[in-house]
Amino acid sequence: MKVKYFFLTLLIFILPSNLLGETKVENENHQMNLFVGNFDFSDDKQKATLLGFQHQDENLNRNTFLGNVSPITGGFVTENSAAYVYTGVEWNVDMGSFYFTPSFAPGLYHEGDGKDLGHVLEFKSEVQLSYKTTDTTNFAVSYNHVSNASLGDKNPGANSYMFNF
């Protein structure tokens, strides 16, 4: 079990490090993403409306062998007082007026009166498709899965979809 925690810790600290590429520093350019959606939509007994935010500092973008990688930080709350805060990385794939953005972010989950996900440490994997309306505005739809990777006694996971602005 200690080996599992060691490798998870190693992944969390090494993945966003300078080992993956050079830092691209530009103007003070930050993105704030606001989203609303349905948490755990695939479980009729536990689904709940969610509201969240995500911050991206484009000054910290890195061009790597994996493409353009950027750190992200965010969180959401559900109508059942569950909360999740996270920090991780996203990959931005430019497709003209559209962007395809997969991301991965470990975070801390508090169930409140919502779904018990089995552990405080949860991992969010997400895909997002955005349409660029102006230089500073995107509309997007995204899907994510939050899971504890079997760190806890149970690992039900939660599937969510969101609309992003």
Residue ranges and their predicted role:
Residues 30-40, 66-78, 101-110, 142-147:
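Transmembrane beta-strand segments that form the barrel wall of outer-membrane beta-barrel proteins
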Residues 35, 52-54, 88-90, 128, ...:
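Outer-membrane beta-barrel architecture
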Residues 1-27:
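Cleavable N-terminal export/targeting peptides
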Residues 40-44, 59-61, 79-83, 108-114, ...:
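Gram-negative outer-membrane beta-barrel proteins
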Residues 20-29, 43-44, 59-69, 94-100, ...:
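Short loop/turn motifs that connect adjacent beta-strands in outer-membrane beta-barrel proteins
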Residues 47-53, 156-165:
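Outer-membrane beta-barrel "beta-signal"
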Residues 55-57, 91-93, 131, 145, ...:
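Residue-level signature of outer-membrane beta-barrel architecture
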